[in-house]
């Protein structure tokens, strides 16, 4: 029988934990416990290391392993970014080491697999559960030679059940908003089975946890896939909402399933979206903005967030932070006086206060005074009571106080910003500079000396050397 590894429960005094974890003294005991449990469940932290003189070193190494997996700064310390990842809802399968008690990399020896829905969640109708499960299997059948057939009785290859807490497989669930589900790799008995926490709120949309998305991830494990370090992959361990109606299996997952089972039987092989690479020399941003000291770089359905104090950069789905925003944002800027961030796509724009959407949005850019001939904004930045909008090779200037366009605009970009002789993809303000991004380059324009003082690669902002 195939089972997830589970480790004995560790019980320690607060002082012992504080010594074992290289963290600030003021860190709450709750955070230490969370980190301890996380490393045990997902990174195979053994209990006896806490009882030895090398415990602090072992914990630091496990923290670094976890930080490496999630592309965080490998500090070996329980910093804010690390704690943030640990608190995200996720899959219950470990990221490190085998989660089976059998050696090797099991796979199904037949391609016509069967599945059975043992029970249902009361939050969705039986038909809704059936549809979500079918769609989740379809994601994998399109990319591989595998087929999936539901059976209503008898022994299936993959059994699907909604269960809670301790449910007899040595991998108990933890209640709402923690571990969402888990699954077992191919094999007899429990092998291939997928369990969903019945205490979670399962939905068909962006609220709470979308059953289709979680099921598709878990079925990847049922077929033999492990977790991916690619934050855009379906097999990434943390939950992130993506629009189900337009969902396409990412290329990383296609590569993974075809490595195990070979290509699809279809004459035309499927291709999927790839996660943008920070150090791609051809990388160009869709939009950039600051937000209360942080810098955001948007690309397709993702954004990089740069922390000025930590000097770290992390990649996230737009939908993870703002499920109401579209992918492919085209412009953004921060209004420092109003403490708002405005984001644009096509003729629509949204306003955020921190991470919260303001009421009454989206609105049409005609509110700024743009004519119907303007169908999209390339970039925007606000400075000294004025907001500059960049559209093709022109710049429009908006008076934030009067809430109208300044007369005499638009003007050509080079006439206003000598040295910026290109279309502007994105821009933000830092110190006495406008940072203009065009293709894979950025131009640092000093608005005091009124000239470009530096031209360099855009991805230097993502810590690429």
Swiss-Prot record:
Keyword Cell membrane in annotation: no
Gene Ontology MF terms: endopeptidase activity; metalloendopeptidase activity; peptidase activity; serine-type endopeptidase activity; tumor necrosis factor binding; zinc ion binding
Location of the active site: 218
Reaction equations catalysed: Cleavage of interstitial collagens in the triple helical domain. Unlike EC 3.4.24.7, this enzyme cleaves type III collagen more slowly than type I
Residues engaged in binding Ca(2+) 3: 286, 378, 425
Keyword tags: Calcium, Collagen degradation, Disulfide bond, Extracellular matrix, Glycoprotein, Hydrolase, Metal-binding, Metalloprotease, Protease, Repeat, Secreted, Signal, Zinc, Zymogen
InterPro entries, per database record: Hemopexin-like_dom, Hemopexin-like_dom_sf, Hemopexin-like_repeat, Hemopexin_CS, M10A_MMP, MetalloPept_cat_dom_sf, Pept_M10_metallopeptidase, Pept_M10A
Source species, domain of life: Eukaryota
Tissue specificity note: Neutrophils. Expressed in uterus. Low levels in kidney and muscle.
Uppermost EC category: hydrolase
PROSITE patterns according to UniProt: CYSTEINE_SWITCH, HEMOPEXIN, HEMOPEXIN_2, ZINC_PROTEASE
Segments carrying motif Cysteine switch: 89-96
Gene Ontology CC entries for this record: extracellular matrix; extracellular space
EC number: 3.4.24.34
UniProt binding sites for Ca(2+) 2: 174-175, 177, 179, 197, 200
GO biological process annotation, one example: positive regulation of tumor necrosis factor production
Entry remark concerning the domains of this protein: The conserved cysteine present in the cysteine-switch motif binds the catalytic zinc ion, thus inhibiting the enzyme. The dissociation of the cysteine from the zinc ion upon the activation-peptide release activates the enzyme.
Family note: Belongs to the peptidase M10A family.
PANTHER family according to UniProt: MATRIX METALLOPROTEINASE, NEUTROPHIL COLLAGENASE
Protein name listed in UniProt: Neutrophil collagenase
GN (gene name): Mmp8
